[in-house]
Amino acid sequence: MNIPADLLYTKDHEWIKVLDDGTTALVGITDFAQSELGDIVFVETKPVGTELSEHDVFGTVEAVKTVADLFAPVDGVIVEVNEALDAAEVVNSSPYEDGWMVKVSLKDASQFDALMSAAEYSEMVGE
């Protein structure tokens, strides 16, 4: 299983990557999550401009057998939705690169302290 060291993780199997500008971040689901869900057929997110609080549901992922909520790892505002999600299977094939869900404008960087490192996430999922 792929667990990139440069990302932070939640217990709900989302990842977040702060971009070089330091004010925005990409959010998606982990390789573990996509493998547990199986073949993803549809992804729906809230629209650009939606304000999120940590743990808010910002969308859903529909797989052949189940539907799962997507949870915001931090407070922020959705500033972009990944258009590649129109082909939802990209989440299975590239969860950390092409399959990101939303880009958020960050509000409080101190919230990162509550997120897990790659090593902590790996331990949580038993890798």
Swiss-Prot record:
Q: Which InterPro entries match?
A: 2-oxoA_DH_lipoyl-BS, Biotin_lipoyl, GCV_H, GCV_H/Fam206, GCV_H_sub, Single_hybrid_motif
Q: Does the keyword Lyase apply?
A: no
UniProtKB keywords: Lipoyl
Q: Which GO terms describe its cellular component?
A: cytosol; glycine cleavage complex
Pfam families tied to this protein: GCV_H (PF01597)
The record's cofactor note says:
Binds 1 lipoyl cofactor covalently.
An example GO biological process term is: glycine decarboxylation via glycine cleavage system
Cofactors, names only:
(R)-lipoate
The chain residues annotated with the modification N6-lipoyllysine are 65
Where in this chain does the record put each Lipoyl-binding domain? 24-105
What does the UniProt record say this protein does? The glycine cleavage system catalyzes the degradation of glycine. The H protein shuttles the methylamine group of glycine from the P protein to the T protein.
Q: Which family does it belong to?
A: Belongs to the GcvH family.
Subunit details for this protein? The glycine cleavage system is composed of four proteins: P, T, L and H.
List the protein's name: Glycine cleavage system H protein
- UniProt lineage: Bacteria, Pseudomonadati, Chlorobiota, Chlorobiia, Chlorobiales
